Amino acid sequence: MRHRKSGRQLNRNSSHRQALFRNLASALVSHEIIKTTLPKAKELRRVVEPLITLAKVDSVANRRLAFARTRNIETVAKLFNELGPRFAQRAGGYTRILKCGFRAGDNAPMAYIELVDRPALAEEAKTE
């Protein structure tokens, strides 16, 4: 019986799942929007939101915890230098999931997952 077993297995063993979410979390923090399957996006929320909450208080201990969970120095730097201060006044709900149809090859439901207060697209176009 599967009583009280939380989280999705995603047809992977635990180390593969852990590596998958480390990579997806690093990609989301660096790009602030990524496209992935809907179940992965829903599960990624459970990884990224606690990291951003951790980044709201900048301490050596919190940086080490974030590094232990992501294993990426650039991700930790962006979390604590940019995202922590940006979301300082927001109490949770840092991500948004937007469904975007189905993948052509296998009809898997796809979604964009993004950080809610990311800079507008017009500003990005001006900088390019």
UniProtKB/Swiss-Prot annotation:
InterPro entries: Ribosomal_bL17, Ribosomal_bL17_CS, Ribosomal_bL17_sf. GO terms for molecular function: structural constituent of ribosome. One of its GO terms (cellular component) is cytosolic large ribosomal subunit. PROSITE patterns: RIBOSOMAL_L17. One of its GO terms (biological process) is translation. Keywords: Ribonucleoprotein, Ribosomal protein. This is Large ribosomal subunit protein bL17. HAMAP family: Ribosomal_bL17. Belongs to the bacterial ribosomal protein bL17 family. Part of the 50S ribosomal subunit. Contacts protein L32. It comes from Histophilus somni (strain 2336) (Haemophilus somnus).
